Amino acid sequence: MPLQPTPPAPWLRGLTERRCSRRGLLRAALGAAALAPLAACSVPGARKPVPGTAAEIAAAVGDFWTGRKKKGRLSFANYTQYIDTDPGDQSRHPTLEAFTRETGIKVSYDEVIDDSASWFGKIQPEFASGQGIGYDLMVLGGDSYLPKYIELGYLAPLDHSRLPHFARYGGTAFKNSSFVRGNVYTVPWQSGMTGIGYDPAKVGRKITSWQDLLDPKLRGKVGMWNDAVQLGNVALLAVGVDPETSTHADWRKAAAWLREQRDAGLVRSYSTSTYQSSLQRGDIYASLVYSGDVFQANRSGSRLEFVIPEEGGLLWTDNLCIPSTAAHPVDALTYMDYAYRPEVAAKISETVQFVCPVPDAQPVIARDADAADGKRRSLLRSLSTSPLVFPTKADEAKLRHLRVLDETEEKQWNALFEPIYQS
């Protein structure tokens, strides 16, 4: 029997496994969503009117929350390794334990979500029949499945009067996007950015624009993705259009930009699975990347740069939400607000190391770094000073959100962008 490798230290796993596995799952989910329409969306009568005006939202919130009370229990569904852990005992989650001590709410925490597609398929029958899914709180990926949950009435509208910490400490870049319907149903859990990663030693200059990925000097040295959702949205940015407000005419213009890039021989490959290693090996010099890819690679010895181009980059967000059938929604809402305390957000960020949606967690991590030693101190200092975890105000101003697509638009979108990498 071959020897098993020694497990990496907890702090190192945070730089590799969590970041890789979570984003890998998102890539798989985005691909699945782009390739096939959601079965639930074709269920006759399944869609429900979504509150749009302030009065409609207030009425929906009142209807759901009136008479609801704390019950002292909470069932929480999440992705694997996507919350803080005790460095000495990976099965323990200190912030959950502290939450129980403070509130008396006992938490049943399960890492049962593998990807958006399989999770939706697992719980959709229960939702459709009006039954509980067994969870009061869940993390949903920021992909094309999320709007479907909202349209089908599967998420509870949030009572923001009970979320004072979110109001006070939630970063402005993470609020009120059309993709999440203005936080009516969700608040961010963790986030990340999509931009350009490049090797300055290979490129020989700074990259500042999506147009730099049309530079003839980079022929055969650019990496792009076989992911219609991300590819189409960044191409919209490249042609100067905010994805959230884009039209079908804008999509055609973006697809033309991508075809120009492809036909000029600039792209070595379209892949969401190999671009990281290709960039580190020097097979490609510049690529579409997630911000965390560069943070991870540089902690491992690479000297890559990440840039949010002047035309803008994408901010993606995984979201906390409450199922409309939750048995303990007040307890879930209590935890939502608790997670937005800077000291709690800091502890979670120190483990998962994604973009933190609570900017005031940054000085907390800096203080924790001062109190730590060795590798732990080095890690926490890197986290507290990295614009890949705490984006600068200038970078935040350039971040945009994904375009929300209805069922008809999704088919039109895929018809334009999938052939770019399939042909």
Segment roles from a protein language model:
Residues 65, 131-138, 156-195, 221:
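A structural signal for short loop-to-beta-strand junctions that line the ligand-binding cleft
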Residues 149-157, 181-183, 296-308, 375:
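Ligand-binding "clamshell"
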Residues 1-20, 31-37:
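N-terminal secretory signal peptides
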Residues 146-147, 223-227, 231, 235, ...:
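Ligand-binding pocket segment of bilobal, Venus flytrap-like solute-binding proteins
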Residues 42-49:
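Bacterial lipoprotein signal-peptidase II cleavage site
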Residues 323-396:
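Mature extracytoplasmic/periplasmic domains
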Residues 388-423:
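Conserved C-terminal helix/tail region of periplasmic/extracytoplasmic solute-binding proteins
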Residues 57-144:
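Early extracytoplasmic/lumenal segment of secretory-pathway proteins
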